[in-house]
Structures are given as C-alpha cells and as structure tokens.
Amino acid sequence: VAYCHEMLPVRPGDHIVSMLPLGHVFGMVYDFLYGFSAGAHLYFLTRMPSPKIIAQSFSEIRPRVISCVPLIVEKIIKKDILPRIDNKIGKLLLRMPIVNDKIKADMRKKAMEVFGSNFDEIIIGGAPFNAEVERFLKQIGFPYTIAYGMTECGPIICYEDWTRFKPGSCGKAAPRMEVKILSSDPENIPGEIVCRGPNIMLGYYKNDEATVQVLDKDGWLHTGDLA
C-alpha cells in the first residue's frame, strides 16, 4: 500500500471504482486499501461487472486510478474504440502523416472518455494482455501500464510509470525489490524469475513444506514463472 502511494498518489476525495474481487490480494490492495488509506471515495459495483456496466460506472464516477485485469480493457476497447478505425478507410487514413496524428488524438480522446477522462493511468495485471489491443493503445498514446506480481508479494514485484513503460514488458523491479532470472544467459536463455524484498511473505500458513519449496535460505522467492 505504501508503494502504491509512492508511485501514484491518491488524494482525499478522489474516486476509485472497486471491481476486482476483494478475496484476491490485487483487488484488496489496489481497489480497497490503496484508496481507503488516502481518504478516497470508493465505489463498489453491486451488479456483475460486465463491460457495459463498467464503462457506465467509469463515465459517472470518473475515477482517478483504474486497476483491472486485461480482459476488461480488451473488451471495452474492442467494442467501443477499435471498430471506428478497423476498416479500409480507417487503415488508409492512418498511413497519411498529418491525418494520422489527428486520428490518433481523436481515438485517444474517445478512449479516455470511455474510462471517465479523469484517470492518471490504468494499471493492468493478473494475466497476459492482448497484443493487438496493446499495440493500438501505445500507438495512440493512451496512459496504461502493465504490472507483474503475485499474492506472496502483496502483490507487486514489477511496475513502471506509463510514460516510461515499454510494450510487451511488465515494468521493472519495484523500489526495494530485487528481481533476477535464474539463467546462465538471461538475455537469451529463459530462466525462472526469483525476487526478494520486504513485501515477501513470511511463509504459507501452517505449511512449512510448501514454504521451503518456494522460499530459499537467502530469502529469494521462486515464482515459478519463466522469462
């Protein structure tokens, strides 16, 4: 929670839409504790969060920060934004330099409006992001970023501000976190991602056997993920 406030401060009176399951650490931290600890106004969806309901809530509530899984962004962008240019005329206009910039600015404005127009950035995590949608968002300069984490890390491991974020990545090691790839040649040979920091769990509750399988004697958490 402290890191959330460091990377993207939320102020008293700001609005946050809580739509992630609070039984998961991503939802509990980003959709509840993050805003609650800053005195923000939290809005809980009372119906199943379909893309239509979520888009409507964004429009009415105008949240300051949005945290969500990739599927939500993908469905909203594919339904409300991409169809506007996913045709022969749209693709032709995108090849024309001056018109290209105008279309991108217009698409960015419309995409921002769909999500309430008042947010600093959208933090996406929890699953792989659709490459087509990501290319489009980067092309129009939309403020999104993709973070990487897991429950055992409470949950953040990697993050980068959207202005420095590189497409296809999930940010860089968060402050006070150490991250490395167990490989003889990390740039060319995949290896397991391991991390170490003050936010790493102490261990699994009453399950020492499972704990020693993921936490080594030097405090490195073995994520089981490859990079």
Question: Where do the protein language model's features map onto the residues?
Answer:
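A structural signal for short hydrophobic beta-strand segments in well-ordered beta-sheet cores
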Residues: 171, 179-181, 225-227
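Short, structured coil segments at secondary-structure junctions
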Residues: 38-39, 61, 139-141, 175
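Phosphate-coordination loops involved in phosphoryl transfer and adenosine-cofactor binding
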Residues: 12-13, 118-119, 190, 217-218
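Conserved ATP-binding/catalytic segment of the ANL
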Residues: 187-227
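Conserved AMP-binding/adenylation subdomain of ANL enzymes
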Residues: 2-15, 22-109
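Alpha-helix/helix-capping structural signal
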Residues: 71-74, 127-128, 199
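Active-site glycine/GP-rich loop and adjacent strand/helix microenvironment
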Residues: 126-128, 132-134, 138-139, 157-161, ...
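Gly/Ser/Thr-rich phosphate-binding loop
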Residues: 64-67, 77-165
